[in-house]
A protein has these predicted regions:
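Active-site loop segments of alpha/beta catalytic cores
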Residues: 1-195
Length: 195
């Protein structure tokens, strides 16, 4: 609540601070890549705590800035950018089209969005109905953006047969799953819950 109060009471100052944080995150990610990281992921685990308008004001521009700065800095050193993943927990339901345009190669899905909904949004972007970042994806790929995640981490506490069924369901079109369409990293929809 304190952070949101700050955002609402000091929006300009918040944006300045968020840009500084994005700048430092980008520098840190570039250092990781220069040290050998072959893929990077940017997490915004609190994105769903913001309304759609607030997400587009106080989160999305800075997620985009990180991706752009990382690529620009690497290009200035003649280093190819590795794949970049963005994970904005809870924001996909209202902002997936904007997240697709944010400059990342992979969109991390939480367990609250059906994979086929996300895949349809990626397909719409690929087909030119949505302006998409020129840096995302690779030439010649079936889909310019891959998807990752979606399995509810709490399922790991279930019996093995339940876990197996949930993983199978991730791939079935009839249950909203990926349906064998496009690039997918099978993964959890968030971190492993302690306990």
């Amino acid at each position: 609540d304190k952070a949101k109060r700050w955002l609402f009471n000091y929006p300009e100052e918040s944006c300045v601070l968020l840009q500084r944080i994005a700048d430092e995150c980008a520098k840190f990610l570039v250092a990781q890549i220069c040290a050998g990281a072959q893929i990077i992921q940017v997490f915004d685990s609190w994105a769903g705590e913001l309304s759609p308008a607030d997400f587009r004001t106080f989160a999305l521009p800075y997620l985009s800035s990180i991706a752009e700065q990382v690529r620009d800095h690497l290009a200035s050193m003649s280093i190819e950018s590795p794949p970049m993943i963005v994970y904005a927990k809870g924001a996909l339901g209202h902002s997936i089209h904007e997240i697709i345009k944010s400059g990342y190669n992979v969109i991390g899905l939480d367990h609250t969005i059906e994979p086929m909904v996300a895949r349809a949004a990626v397909k719409k972007a690929r087909d030119g109905k949505t302006k998409m970042s020129q840096v995302a994806g690779t030439k010649g790929s079936g889909h310019p953006i891959a998807l990752q995640g979606n399995l509810d981490p709490a399922v790991l506490y279930a019996k093995p047969e339940v876990i197996q069924e949930r993983v199978r369901r991730m791939f079935k079109t009839s249950t909203g799953g990926f349906g064998g369409q496009g690039a997918l990293v099978c993964n959890l929809g968030h971190g492993i819950t302690p306990g």
